[in-house]
């Protein structure tokens, strides 16, 4: 399931860097984290859904790449974001 539009807007509002920001690494990572959390809950009841599990692994990889990029350009923003989202390093 895709994110509900209201929840998506909340995340964009919370993590945006300026007024019209929707594509900064912080916003993208927050949206991916929300989708990953949803799929993780989905797999607790649908253990054999291997097709969606592959999608989850792609999302995790994409989030990891964005976090690596953010860490390379600004260590402080990276640390703040992983603390706010509760992501392991």
Curated annotation (Swiss-Prot):
User: Record's Pfam families?
Assistant: Ribosomal_S15 (PF00312)
Which is a GO BP term held by this UniProt record? translation
In terms of SMART domains, this protein maps to: Ribosomal_S15
InterPro entries under this entry? Answer: Ribosomal_uS15, Ribosomal_uS15_bac-type, uS15_NS1_RNA-bd_sf
Q: Does the keyword Nucleotidyltransferase apply?
A: no
Task: Write out the GO cellular component annotations.
Answer: cytosolic small ribosomal subunit
S-S bonds: none
SUPFAM superfamilies with a match to the protein in the record: S15/NS1 RNA-binding domain (SSF47060)
Keywords recorded for this protein, A-Z: Ribonucleoprotein, Ribosomal protein, RNA-binding, rRNA-binding
List the GO molecular function terms. Answer: rRNA binding; structural constituent of ribosome
Q: Which family does it belong to?
A: Belongs to the universal ribosomal protein uS15 family.
Q: How does it assemble?
A: Part of the 30S ribosomal subunit. Forms a bridge to the 50S subunit in the 70S ribosome, contacting the 23S rRNA.
* HAMAP family the UniProt entry points to: Ribosomal_uS15_B
NCBIfam families linked to this entry: S15_bact
What PANTHER family does this protein map onto? RIBOSOMAL PROTEIN S15, BACTERIAL AND ORGANELLAR, SMALL RIBOSOMAL SUBUNIT PROTEIN US15M
Function according to Swiss-Prot or TrEMBL: One of the primary rRNA binding proteins, it binds directly to 16S rRNA where it helps nucleate assembly of the platform of the 30S subunit by binding and bridging several RNA helices of the 16S rRNA. Forms an intersubunit bridge (bridge B4) with the 23S rRNA of the 50S subunit in the ribosome.
This chain belongs to which protein, by name? Small ribosomal subunit protein uS15
The scientific name of the source species is Anaeromyxobacter sp. (strain Fw109-5)
Gene encoding this chain? rpsO
């Amino acid at each position: 399931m895709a994110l509900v539009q209201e929840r998506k807007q909340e995340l964009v509002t919370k993590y945006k860097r300026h007024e019209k920001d929707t594509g900064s690494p912080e916003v993208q990572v927050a949206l991916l984290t929300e989708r990953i959390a949803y799929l993780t809950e989905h797999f607790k009841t649908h253990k054999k859904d291997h097709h969606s599990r592959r999608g989850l692994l792609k999302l995790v990889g994409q989030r990891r790449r964005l976090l690596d990029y953010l860490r390379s350009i600004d260590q402080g923003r990276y640390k703040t974001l992983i603390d706010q989202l509760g992501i392991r390093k």
